[in-house]
Amino acid sequence: MHLKGSDFLAVINVTPLMDITSLINSDNVNEGDVLLLEEGIYFQSVAVLKNNIRIIAKGPGVIFDGKSTLLDAFLLPDVVGVMIEGITIRHYRASGILIEFGFGHRIVNNKISNMIEHGVEVMSSRDNLIWRNEINKCYDGVLLIEGSTNNWVIENVATECYGDGFEAFLAPDSNNAFISNKAIRNRNNGLEIYGTNNLLMNNLLIDNGQGVIINEGNNSVAIGNIIKGTRVGTYTIFDGYFNHFVGGNNITCNRREGIENNGQFEVIYKNEISYNGDNGILLGSTSALNLVMNNTLLCNIPENIDDRGIDNYIINNIEKPCDPCETPSDVCNNCSNEDGNSIDGSKEGVD
């Protein structure tokens, strides 16, 4: 590794006519160098095979267009500390950015759209930051898979994806944080989270097929999320998941249950759950020894809380039925009309 800055490290100007993969592999690029991309349309796939390379857009007009023929726009195979910042990526047949193995990458402020696979895919990698990216019309917006751990997914926007907005898939994908992201109008889930000790905090999930799925693991935490307008299910905890904490979330105007818990030893605490179309909280037949405490439930039909499980503890919840002639659909349809502009605005990015 080079340690003496001016003698070894460089800012290298790059144009669309240059083969970036070949440039990185050449003796002209060393660890720690910055590739400063001139504005223009780049038709190429870039494999970054050296550590600590920073690939930075010089302006907003840096566009990587795969023209529906190239696979991944950027491939980071078993390298460390790569930064990709400020690039528009569109029309690739695989993923916008694929991280395989390695660790410590920074994926920041990119706009990724129209991938056949995923916006950002992280495979068997750890300690990555995925921050302030806007992802539209991919399969999953951000996918963590095959034992990806200790990743930070913060302030990203995923809209109109064919799969999930954000996903940590299967039990080995643990110790990840999803904070202040927006998932809007995705076909499947806003957040599909498998694994242990994951954090879901202050995310906004609007008009997705389903809001949140929690499966295969234990000890994950969800605090301060807003879930509204789901069609298939809202917040589902699967049988066999232990010690999940759901606290301080706002769950309103969803077609099915506000929270469906089929797991064991969960804590459902101080949530606001209102105007959902198929119970506020459903404790399924496999649920056992869960604590449901200090929640506020308003006009969920047919019941605010439906306990079908074993030895669940329901304490100090505030429950209010619907007013006469009031239904969730009436209230939610009015709210949707009034809030339409704010929802559309939220899909444009994180301020």
Task: Identify the residue ranges that each predicted region occupies.
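Extracellular beta-strand-rich solenoid/capping regions of secreted or surface-exposed proteins
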Residues: 21, 25-30, 41-56, 63-104, ...
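Short glycine/acidic-rich loop motifs that flank beta-strands on beta-rich extracellular proteins
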Residues: 42-48, 60-73, 93-98, 116-123, ...
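Parallel beta-helix/beta-solenoid
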Residues: 30, 50-51, 59, 78-79, ...
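Glycine-centered, small-residue-biased loops immediately flanking beta-strands
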Residues: 33
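Short acidic DE-rich linear segments
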Residues: 350-351
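Right-handed parallel beta-helix/beta-solenoid
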Residues: 1-24
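Leucine-rich solenoid repeat scaffolds
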Residues: 279, 283-330, 334-343
